[in-house]
Regions:
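A short acidic, Gly/Pro-enriched loop at the edge of an enzyme's catalytic core
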Residues: 206-213
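A structural motif shared across PLP-dependent enzymes of the aminotransferase-like
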Residues: 94-107
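Glycine-rich beta-strand-centered segment in the early N-terminal region that forms part
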Residues: 21-39, 51-94
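C-terminal hydrophobic helical "lid"/dimerization subdomain
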Residues: 267-316
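Glycine-rich phosphate-binding loop and adjacent beta-alpha segment
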Residues: 220-282, 315-316
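Mid-domain Rossmann-like dinucleotide-binding core that forms the NAD(H)/NADP(H) cofactor-binding site
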Residues: 82, 123-198
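N-terminal Rossmann-like NAD(P) cofactor-binding module of classical short-chain dehydrogenase/reductase
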Residues: 88, 214-215, 236
Length: 316
């Protein structure tokens, strides 16, 4: 089978298209014929070595956490799936392996795709969608059906996690403000944002009422957002930086909560997101699609920070 592989830490230049033996699913695992995968910033950040202290890689490595495809075979003890079933998942294994013709996925991570969901959308949704959902619901404590009156600020509202976060917060009943460039503001408004702030304008944040929840999908420093937060606000960063951990130590008596959020793969959460999509309550924006051998170019697009929504890798 074809796979994009890295043999050591580095950038996209380290990616090579190689031929590997088709893997066999062990107990509790499922072999999936991958139709689409998707790019997440954690892919190239881990590959660069920037996260090696907390998320080391084993080489050679095949990147790619998100997959959508068809069940080929199942290991011992796997139930609830059948050969040919259309499925998608966020692979929980630290070495992932989604950017290949076939991928091994834990049965507990795998979810049947809703009728009518295309493979590209199914591959774009898992990691970004679950991160947004968990960051708001679990990290910030936003009630999913009773958030009326809560003011939510989504920083990076046009990105992979952010554009889904805007919609989830809106579905919960919150007043949602998105932060993005002026060029992307119309798209974020289309997703349901009540207000959009253009971060490129120096006066964009003047006179803005404070927020109860800040979902930061860009950086890990609560400092720039403190003046826009209520006294008991919850700040959650899905890209934790040093200050996400240090700020609570420096401000032990503050009623504001600052929290880093790391995704926990949860099939029930993916099913919840699938339900939103099926009801027409969630749109998954795809910035661009690249063939498997062009994974390096897809990474460069992600690194540029200009992608709107998710970047998809077309495998089959």
């Amino acid at each position: 089978m074809r796979a994009m592989q890295m043999k050591g830490y580095g950038g996209s230049e380290q990616l090579q298209l190689v031929e590997l033996a088709q893997p066999l699913p062990q107990s509790g695992k499922v072999l999936v014929r991958v139709h689409c995968a998707s790019v997440n910033p954690v892919d190239w950040k881990r590959a660069s070595g920037a996260l090696r202290l907390i998320m080391p890689m084993r080489f050679p490595a095949v990147p790619g956490y998100d997959v959508a495809g068809d069940v080929v075979s199942m290991g011992a003890g796997v139930g609830g799936f059948s050969v040919g079933m259309r499925v998608h998942a966020r692979i929980a294994d630290m070495n992932a392996g989604g950017c290949a013709d076939y991928a091994i996925v834990g049965a507990a991570e795998l979810v049947a795709m809703p009728d009518g969901m295309p493979y590209d959308v199914a591959a774009a949704l898992p990691l970004a969608g679950m991160t947004a959902l968990q960051g708001l619901r679990d990290g910030a404590g936003l009630p999913m059906a009773a958030a009326a009156g809560t003011r939510v600020l989504v920083v990076g509202a046009s990105g992979g996690v952010g554009h889904i976060g805007v919609q989830i917060a809106k579905q919960a009943g919150a007043w949602v403000t998105g932060v993005c460039s002026g060029a992307n503001a119309p798209r974020v408004r289309e997703l349901g944002a009540d207000e959009v702030l253009d971060y490129t304008r120096g006066d964009a944040f003047n006179g803005v009422a404070p927020f109860d929840v800040v979902l930061d999908c860009v950086g890990g420093d609560p400092g720039p957002w403190l003046r826009l937060m209520t006294a008991q606000a919850r700040y959650v960063s899905v890209i934790p930086g040093p200050m996400t951990f240090i700020w609570p130590l420096l401000n032990p008596f503050s009623r504001r909560r600052v929290k880093p959020w790391m995704l926990k793969t949860n099939a029930d959460d993916l099913r919840y997101l699938d339900g939103l999509w099926q009801r027409g309550s969630l749109k998954v924006i795809i910035d661009d699609r690249y063939p498997l051998p062009s994974l390096g170019q897809a990474w460069q697009r992600s690194i540029s920070g200009r992608a709107v929504g998710k970047i998809v890798i077309e495998v089959a």
